[in-house]
């Protein structure tokens, strides 16, 4: 167990791991911090010709020759223009300066690069048998990687600021607003004009889940305000996208040191999953590794020792273009599957650990909605539903959105239309997921890109 610290000390993603062996194998890479600036030197301007050179007869008198008055003319010196340097633009606190104004070259920093094992025979097989596929993948690298790295840098800068303001007494609605305002400011897309939110911004509603609420809870308009308390365990899960390239990352904050081992268990389990991820990695092996690491921990609550359990019915997942959930899953418990990770995959490796029964049920309320582009609209007759669907397609596409996002666009009286869309299976609704009352759940998550010759933990920062 970690050493106790003075009261009100925040325990979160910056805590050192009680499993240094894992961190030694997969150390966090120092990511770009919120004060990172890029500047460039303007090139030295070409010196202009002397204005007298264009006068008639100017070419008759060479420099240094004797003039008509018998005096030797002095050679004229061209004035050198001094180099000028662009003013460095720093990120503000809270972060509200668009990254495009800081990174003038529009090139964003790479994240943690992990080379594949040199004794992996499949690496040579991939290079020999799929050369054409790799060349196609490499042709996409510049745009693909830069979009992902920009989204990741936005996520890092926003969450680093947010960690400084998360304290007992803050309202969760204020916290959600700080996160979402920061993302929209740094991507320079407020999402108020039609289609603007599809260019860059929030990939899904900010998840702020307390204690036994594991996932899919966000403040909703008109709901009772929720205030963070000292004994709460808060999970912060938000996504950033740039041109549909989604970075999904989450962390947990606790102030009371009794939860130290719970957070350490989940953080170590996530890092173990990231370490095992790679081209041709067996998902069954990754799942078993995650469970073994997480369930090696115990937590003492109310003078009772409780084992940390891996949550059984929620999983990590691959991420697709404009879709937060793909068709591949990474459970946190031992599973029977022959599925493997593949080159070019993007995975959100996340883990949830619980002091409860580690099985989640749907709670009352709605977290958000997602449009199913493959659903038939043949049975849709209500004009309000058709109008709402048009708004959803134009502003969110297949990205998950919440009621707050609709009302931010000025959409009113949408409840009947939304009910019709959900009933017809055109839009899917997501409920909060909860463990038993009195239990505590923690979460950590990173997005990893499985590139041809390495994996890039794109959301890695110096915080977690």
Curated annotation (Swiss-Prot):
This is Methionine aminopeptidase 2. GO terms for biological process: proteolysis. Pfam families: Peptidase_M24. Cotranslationally removes the N-terminal methionine from nascent proteins. The N-terminal methionine is often cleaved when the second residue in the primary sequence is small and uncharged (Met-Ala-, Cys, Gly, Pro, Ser, Thr, or Val). GO terms for molecular function: initiator methionyl aminopeptidase activity; metal ion binding; metalloaminopeptidase activity. CDD domains: MetAP2. Residues 72-83 have a biased composition (Basic residues). Its cofactor is Co(2+); Zn(2+); Mn(2+); Fe(2+). The keyword Hydrolase applies. The keyword Metal-binding applies. Belongs to the peptidase M24A family. Methionine aminopeptidase eukaryotic type 2 subfamily. It catalyses: Release of N-terminal amino acids, preferentially methionine, from peptides and arylamides.
């Amino acid at each position: 167990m970690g050493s106790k610290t003075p009261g009100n000390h925040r325990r979160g993603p910056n805590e050192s791991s009680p499993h240094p062996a894992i961190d030694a194998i997969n150390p966090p890479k120092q990511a770009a911090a919120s004060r990172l600036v890029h500047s460039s030197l303007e090139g030295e301007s070409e010196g202009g010709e002397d204005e007298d050179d264009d006068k008639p007869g100017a070419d008759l008198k060479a420099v240094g020759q004797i003039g008509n008055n018998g005096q030797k003319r002095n050679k004229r010196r061209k004035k050198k223009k001094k180099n000028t340097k662009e003013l460095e633009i720093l990120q503000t606190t809270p972060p509200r300066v668009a990254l495009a104004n800081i990174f003038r070259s529009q090139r964003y920093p790479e994240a943690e690069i992990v080379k594949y094992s040199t004794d992996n025979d499949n690496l040579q097989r991939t290079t020999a048998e799929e050369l054409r596929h790799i060349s196609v993948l490499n042709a996409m690298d510049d745009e693909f990687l830069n979009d992902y790295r920009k989204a990741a840098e936005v996520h890092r800068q926003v969450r680093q600021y947010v960690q400084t303001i998360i304290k007992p007494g803050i309202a969760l609605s204020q916290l959600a607003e700080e996160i979402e305002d920061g993302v929209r400011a740094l991507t320079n897309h407020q999402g108020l004009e039609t289609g603007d939110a599809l260019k860059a911004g929030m990939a899904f509603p900010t998840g702020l889940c307390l204690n036994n609420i594991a996932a899919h809870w966000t403040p909703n308009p008109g709901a009772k305000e929720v205030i963070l308390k000292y004994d709460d365990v808060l999970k912060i899960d938000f996504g950033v996208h740039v041109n549909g390239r989604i970075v999904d990352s989450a962390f947990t904050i606790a102030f009371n040191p009794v939860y130290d081992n719970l957070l350490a268990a989940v953080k170590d389990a996530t890092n173990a999953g990231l370490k095992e991820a790679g081209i041709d990695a067996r998902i069954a092996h990754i799942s078993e590794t995650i469970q073994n690491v997480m369930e090696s921990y115990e937590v003492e609550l109310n003078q009772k020792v409780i084992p940390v359990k891996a949550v059984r019915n929620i999983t990590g997942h691959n991420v697709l273009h404009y879709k937060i959930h793909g068709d591949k899953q990474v459970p946190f418990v031992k599973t029977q599957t022959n599925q493997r990770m593949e080159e070019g995959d993007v995975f959100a490796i996340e883990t949830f650990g619980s002091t409860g029964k580690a099985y989640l049920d749907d709670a009352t309320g709605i977290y958000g909605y997602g449009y199913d582009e493959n659903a038939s609209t043949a049975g849709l007759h209500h004009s309000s539903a058709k109008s709402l669907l048009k708004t959803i397609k134009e502003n969110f596409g297949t990205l998950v959105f919440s009621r707050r996002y609709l009302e931010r666009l000025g959409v009113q009286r949408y409840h009947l239309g939304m009910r019709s869309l959900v009933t017809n299976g055109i839009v899917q609704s997501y409920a909060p997921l909860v463990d038993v009352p009195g239990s505590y759940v923690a979460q950590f998550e990173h997005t990893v890109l499985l590139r041809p010759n390495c994996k890039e933990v794109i959301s890695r920062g110096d915080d977690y």
